[in-house]
Amino acid sequence: MTLWLPASGKIYLPPTPPVARVQSTDEYVERTDIYYHATSDRLLTVGHPYFDVRSPDGSKIDVPKVSGNQFRAFRVTFPDPNKFALADMTIYDPDKYRLVWACAGLEIGRGQPLGVGSTGHPLFNKLRDAENSSERQEGTVDDRRNISFDPKQVQMFIIGCTPCLGEYWDTAPVCKDAGSQLGLCPPLELKNSVIEDGDMFDIGFGNINNKTLSFNRSDVSLDLVNEVCKYPDFLTMSNDVYGDACFFCARREQCYARHYFVRGGVVGDAIPDGAVQQDHKYYLPADQQNTLENSLYFPTVSGSLVTSDSQLFNRPFWLKRAQGHNNGILWNNQMFVTVADNTRNTNFSISVTNDSSLEKYDATKIREFTRHVEEYQLSFILQLCRIPLKAEVLTQINAMNSDILENWQLGFVPTPDNAVHDTYRYLASKATKCPDAVPDTQKEDPFGKYSFWNVDMTEKLSLDLDQYPLGRKFLFQIGVQRVRSGTKRPATRKVTKTVKRKKVQL
């Protein structure tokens, strides 16, 4: 017998208020056929690969830390296109449009030869080799060793008009009723922060805050021990509603476990058989081996072969469609280029002597130094675009970032309150109120608190694309042939004379 029964599931209805739809920049940005080329100077940096070298009193940094395992975060500033003197005045009408830049292509140039760098720690927390163990070894008070290894191989760059967002693991706040946490593993939480110039990226030990999670200062290499190791938060940036942080990215990571070691110290989480008597689920005890050795295993990774066949740099990239709603529009005339590359990770060894009369080798009179150098050059192809000053377009831009309209001098004027304000004349006088109480009228840089490698392109733009390597590649890519300059010589005409024959009358 068939019976009709009421539906047991819930009925989901759409939300009553309308969902705000974010438009893609392709829906309101009008692109022109005017392209500019911009290239930076050769960007060089030199420093110590493991730490900052400070002055004897520690008051200043004599040699900065420059490691091949650091992020390079470039903040590129372009000129305001609304202040350009364009030859075609029909393109720009300040009463109807505002001009913006769009990134059409770029090339991140890298100098210096390929090389594998070595990092390590003179007091690395390594009890013994866990792969080729010949005999049992009991831990002592200090089992640290001088260990060196090559890092995981990383090539990566992220392009956007806002800084790249990174993620790392750090200690989380402890609950109030948790009691004393001395000697216990702290809770962990995933945190986000902007990737700044000089931040360390992951080389095989994970993206964690080593300042708070490495008490012994010997679990990682010397260049990571006092740093926060970050990794780009691709999930958050790809789900950004406006898509400003990451137009597109390219990455290549490779590694393999080269050595297998055991940590020294007391095991925090003991194997359950020996701790809570779980009926020998993990091992069977013996009379001769009634105590277990350390079980904190870890590998040291290697980046393996470095070759020019797998390089992401020194080659052009063209932006046709970005992954988010922002299809390459450079709001506020700036671009952020975040680069990670340790395939040119050679550390120089420099030796000097403190005895000018030394003629034979004496290690006690020779001082060894190490330095790391990096070389970059950034090139861009910019497309000139215009935005119509329509109400619906300005409303979305104002909701996205009101600073854009202020820079365009289109800020919304508030309703006057008809109040009389006080203006003091002598602010530095002791008879008036403290000048610090006067509000600062200077506009604050939203990214001023972060550290970037600033690259000024305000005087680096050119319309002659065929005069630059990236420009010639772009012209070839879009199928534009170069016009040969110069005056052509007229071809010589060959004049032939015809001879008339006289008629002879017979």
Swiss-Prot record:
InterPro entries per the UniProt record, alphabetical: Capsid_L1_Papillomavir (IPR002210), Capsid_L1_sf_Papillomavir (IPR036973), dsDNA_vir_gr_I_capsid (IPR011222)
GO CC terms, sorted: host cell nucleus; T=7 icosahedral viral capsid
Cellular compartments annotated: Virion; Host nucleus
GO molecular function: structural molecule activity
Alphabetic keyword roster: Capsid protein, Disulfide bond, Host nucleus, Host-virus interaction, Late protein, T=7 icosahedral capsid protein, Viral attachment to host cell, Viral penetration into host cytoplasm, Virion, Virus endocytosis by host, Virus entry into host cell
Tagged with keyword Disulfide bond: yes
Pfam family, one: Late_protein_L1
Job of this protein: Forms an icosahedral capsid with a T=7 symmetry and a 50 nm diameter. The capsid is composed of 72 pentamers linked to each other by disulfide bonds and associated with L2 proteins. Binds to heparan sulfate proteoglycans on cell surface of basal layer keratinocytes to provide initial virion attachment. This binding mediates a conformational change in the virus capsid that facilitates efficient infection. The virion enters the host cell via endocytosis. During virus trafficking, L1 protein dissociates from the viral DNA and the genomic DNA is released to the host nucleus.
Subunit note: Self-assembles into homopentamers. The capsid has an icosahedral symmetry and consists of 72 capsomers, with each capsomer being a pentamer of L1. Interacts with the minor capsid protein L2; this interaction is necessary for viral genome encapsidation. Interacts with protein E2; this interaction enhances E2-dependent replication and transcription activation.
Similarity section: Belongs to the papillomaviridae L1 protein family.
HAMAP family membership: PPV_L1
Protein name: Major capsid protein L1
Organism name: Human papillomavirus 23
